Amino acid sequence: MPIYQIDGLTPVVPEESFVHPTAVLIGDVILGKGVYVGPNASLRGDFGRIVVKDGANIQDNCVMHGFPEQDTVVGEDGHIGHSAILHGCIIRRNALVGMNAVVMDGAVIGENSIVGASAFVKAKAEMPANYLIVGSPAKAIRELSEQELAWKKQGTHEYQVLVTRCKQTLHQVEPLREIEPGRKRLVFDENLRPKQ
């Protein structure tokens, strides 16, 4: 994986976390334990600190960056969907930012909230806890139901299990030239582990 030091600052990646080999971490990046960073994600701690706390996931093609001396933080069990952009913002514990959403400088997403796909959260916006946040510009439109909170928790758990799966079985290979006879499909047990 491309990990770069800049101005004497080296990214911190605990052994218990997984960073895909195509993700890029630069400078003042601090990952917690059990963090998943997906393919082609870019975490640039070359102006401000990037913090991803325990159990959070940063999915494929996400960008985390900020202005000089400005932290960008994802709280514990945070869930950042594919191609989201976080710039100098704070995502509180157990919040989800949907695919292609943008959260701008100084914005705060309250804990347990869900930012909908393609939402645009303006700079300095403060969004409440336990709310659905959608639109461009984004607005907190209603409280989340227990079912929605459970759905979010389950999705994040799937990525926490994926950390272990990747560390144990992900490796680069040459492709097959044709489908092998009896090709298996991924089928999961109640703990989200593939059945053998």
UniProtKB/Swiss-Prot annotation:
InterPro entries: Hexapep, PaaY, Transf_Hexapept/Carb_Anhydrase, Trimer_LpxA-like_sf. The keyword Metal-binding does not apply. Gene3D superfamilies: Hexapeptide repeat proteins (2.160.10.10). Keywords: Repeat, Transferase. It comes from the Bacteria. Pathway: Aromatic compound metabolism; phenylacetate degradation. Pfam families: Hexapep. This is Phenylacetic acid degradation protein PaaY. The gene is paaY.
